Amino acid sequence: MNTIESRIEDLLLLKFNPTVLNILNESYMHNVPEGAESHFKLVIVTDSFKDISIIKRHKAIYSALEDIIKSIHALSIHPFDEQEYKKKSLYY
């Protein structure tokens, strides 16, 4: 089955080759039909983000998801480079 979640995963793996990629479907916490794929939380760790601003990281992720972004109602993005993630890994 080609779910939105699996497409997000495929596109981000291809574009960023992350060392950590956690995609959490949070749709169940919202007033949507059972099994909906509309709200996601994303934690992505890649050295591609080293010395890149948060805004540019978000833009790069949205660009990678360009083909499916209209299918997603909400996307919470937490992008890190390796060093940042090591400092914050207790929280993610």
For each predicted feature, which ranges?
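Short, glycine/charged-enriched secondary-structure capping and boundary segments
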Residues: 36-39, 57-58, 92
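Short secondary-structure junctions
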Residues: 13-22, 69-72
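C-terminal structural segments of small proteins and small subunits
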Residues: 62-92
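A short interface-forming secondary-structure element
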Residues: 41-54
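Solvent-exposed beta-strand sheet faces enriched in polar/charged residues
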Residues: 24, 43-45, 76-80
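Short edge beta-strands and adjacent turn/loop segments
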Residues: 21-40
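N-terminal presequence-like segments and adjacent domain-start helices
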Residues: 1-4
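Short, non-transmembrane amphipathic alpha-helical segments
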Residues: 8-12, 55-67
